[in-house]
């Protein structure tokens, strides 16, 4: 599985997938192997490499199990920029979001993680994306990460204010280090998402919230 170079669960982007060798030199992995197409229904795909999806145990065993649903096939498509995480007030009261930005801890209970779909989205893709969100209960499991999303929003405000970016650029020059705007964002936010890859848990959430 290591040749697939998958470092986080492709279904949820919440758990690391680690490959290692045991004492006997056998390759092991922390991932479960999900049969994208259930072998009981599609026996011809049972041993197909392209039907094996390394995923976390929660997504594979607890969420999906033997359920067969129209979802995104990770090797070919993901949410990308077509489906993005967002943070919304449950009662559509924008004041709750503002209170959270100002540090009101009680206001976070009135917020929820949701998804936004880009306009003119292909209907079949949208169905598969909605199927993935429903099957893996992404709204529910990401609810615990609301505080992280708010933290990203705060860091976005710090970056857009301008002085942090200027300070970091000056510091890097003094250290004779090259630093792009993207590098500065990486340092501030603590996530790396160059080339559209999400190699760290929650990096998709972080990118979507930061560039909201």
Predicted regions span which residues?
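Domain-level detector of nuclease and nuclease-like folds
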Residues: 62-128
């Amino acid at each position: 599985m290591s040749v697939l170079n998958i470092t986080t669960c492709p279904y949820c982007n919440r758990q690391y997938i680690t490959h290692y060798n045991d004492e006997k030199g056998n390759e092991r992995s922390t991932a479960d192997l999900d049969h994208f197409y259930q072998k009981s229904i599609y026996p011809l795909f049972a041993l197909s490499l392209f039907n094996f999806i390394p995923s976390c145990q929660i997504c594979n065993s607890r969420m999906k199990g033997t359920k067969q649903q129209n979802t995104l096939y990770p090797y070919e498509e993901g949410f990308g920029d077509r489906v993005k995480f967002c943070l919304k007030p449950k009662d559509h009261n924008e004041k709750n979001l503002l209170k959270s930005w100002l540090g009101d801890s009680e206001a976070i209970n009135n917020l929820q993680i949701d998804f936004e779909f880009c306009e003119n989205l292909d209907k079949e893709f949208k169905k598969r994306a909605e199927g993935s969100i429903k099957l893996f209960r992404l709204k529910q499991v990401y609810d615990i990460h609301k505080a992280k999303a708010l933290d990203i929003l705060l860091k976005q405000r710090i970056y857009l204010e301008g002085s942090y970016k200027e300070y970091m650029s000056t510091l890097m020059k003094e250290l004779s280090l090259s630093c792009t705007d993207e590098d500065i964002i990486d340092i501030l936010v603590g996530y790396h998402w160059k080339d559209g890859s999400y190699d760290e848990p929650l990096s998709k959430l972080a990118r979507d919230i930061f560039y909201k």
